């Protein structure tokens, strides 16, 4: 199924039903009093999260959702039927934004969490409501009010404990697949991963969710490549794993690749840049130990600060168990 993480829909709540003007007319009761009933309230529109959904694709094709109107009141003090509510189901992690005002209406981060996004109109009052000691035959009534109408932007942000980032073909997908069994495509060319993928990792009785997003390239913040569009899916993560290829097939400089990623991350969002970030130096099986030491020295000199880093080989699972164990321990703190 195609991964869609953003869409705009229109929601229209039902109008309230009108109140009724009516008088009791029965045999032997020629001057019966008012008996006009109230209208019914308009139907509401709700959004509800569902763990079984992982894309907004269904809402890309149906753009307008309208709840039924409340029915008008009638004689014999009969109230109109309330318009039934409607629910729109979305994936867990969906952020709800008022498209016009940019106000954040809500954020559905739990299963079966729901939020009212368009309130139905209030019912109109029948003439019975206006009877008094000085007005025995009221002809007043009120009309039902109009239901709310809104344009809503829905933005899906995946919920994961750990997120991966790095250049295309750095080995992010291989790592995620090797530790979680996630069904992510792997090949020896850039941008193999076209959409975010979630994997569940179990280690030493502890469990965490890891997200794999498409690789980031230079000038991604200006629209190049794929990754910057999906960086938002790292916003809920507690740790970021910055995967670095120590032996790039394009012969690029690993230190320069680190600089590119950090620069693009900072330009995208400073709060994301400031998240806890571990440096994962990958593909150590393809390079000599002496070369690894030289690269590490250059990285430390570039970063200027002490940053936690790991030496691993995703494909041969060297150092991976220790990494997973440390992640699980960190998340429990």
Swiss-Prot record:
Subcellular compartments: Cytoplasm
Domain Obg, residue spans: 1-159
Assigned keywords, A-Z: Cytoplasm, GTP-binding, Hydrolase, Magnesium, Metal-binding, Nucleotide-binding
Pfam families membership: GTP1_OBG (PF01018), MMR_HSR1 (PF01926)
Enzyme Commission no: 3.6.5.-
Residues holding Mg(2+): 173, 193
InterPro entries: G_OBG (IPR031167), GTP-bd (IPR006073), GTP-bd_Obg/CgtA (IPR014100), GTP1-OBG_CS (IPR006074), GTP1_OBG_dom (IPR006169), GTP1_OBG_dom_sf (IPR036726), OBG_GTPase (IPR045086), P-loop_NTPase (IPR027417)
Domain named OBG-type G: residues: 160-332
GO biological process: ribosome biogenesis
Molecular function per GO: GTP binding; GTPase activity; magnesium ion binding
Enzyme class: hydrolase
Family assignment from sequence similarity: Belongs to the TRAFAC class OBG-HflX-like GTPase superfamily. OBG GTPase family.
HAMAP family assigned to the protein according to its UniProt record, in alphabetical order: GTPase_Obg (MF_01454)
Cited NCBIfam families: Obg_CgtA (TIGR02729), PRK12297.1 (NF008955), PRK12299.1 (NF008956), small_GTP (TIGR00231)
Name of the featured protein: GTPase Obg
Biological classification of the source: Bacteria, Pseudomonadati, Pseudomonadota, Gammaproteobacteria, Enterobacterales
């Amino acid at each position: 199924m195609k991964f869609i993480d953003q869409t705009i829909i229109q929601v229209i709540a039902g109008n309230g039903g009108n109140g009724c003007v009516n008088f009791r007319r029965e045999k032997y009761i020629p001057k019966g009093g008012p008996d006009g009933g109230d209208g019914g309230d308009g139907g509401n529109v709700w959004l509800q999260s569902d763990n079984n959904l992982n894309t907004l694709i269904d809402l890309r094709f149906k753009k307008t959702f309208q709840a039924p109107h409340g029915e008008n009141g009638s004689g014999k003090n009969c109230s109109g039927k309330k318009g039934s509510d409607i629910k729109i189901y979305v994936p867990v992690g969906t952020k709800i934004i008022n498209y016009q005002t940019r106000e954040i209406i809500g954020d559905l981060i739990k299963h079966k969490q729901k939020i009212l996004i368009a309130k139905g109109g209030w019912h109109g009052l029948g003439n019975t409501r206006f009877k008094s000691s000085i007005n025995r035959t009221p002809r007043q009534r009120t009309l039902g009010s109009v239901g709310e109408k809104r344009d809503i932007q829905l933005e899906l942000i995946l919920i994961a404990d750990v997120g991966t980032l790095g250049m295309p073909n750095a080995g992010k997908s291989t790592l995620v697949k090797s530790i979680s069994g996630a069904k992510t495509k792997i090949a020896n060319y850039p941008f193999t991963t076209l959409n975010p993928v979630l994997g569940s990792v179990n280690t030493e009785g502890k469990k965490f969710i890891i997200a794999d997003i498409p690789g980031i390239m230079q000038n991604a913040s200006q629209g190049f490549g794929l990754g910057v569009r999906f960086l938002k899916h790292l916003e809920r993560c507690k740790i970021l794993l910055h995967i670095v290829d120590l032996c790039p097939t394009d012969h690029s400089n690993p230190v320069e690749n680190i600089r590119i990623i950090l620069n693009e991350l900072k330009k995208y969002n400073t709060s994301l840049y400031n998240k806890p970030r571990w440096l994962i130096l990958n593909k150590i099986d393809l390079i000599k130990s002496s070369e690894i030491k030289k690269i590490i020295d250059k990285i430390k000199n570039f970063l200027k600060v002490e940053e936690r880093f790991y030496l691993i080989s995703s494909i041969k699972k060297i150092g991976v168990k220790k990494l997973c164990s440390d992640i699980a321990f960190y998340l429990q703190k």
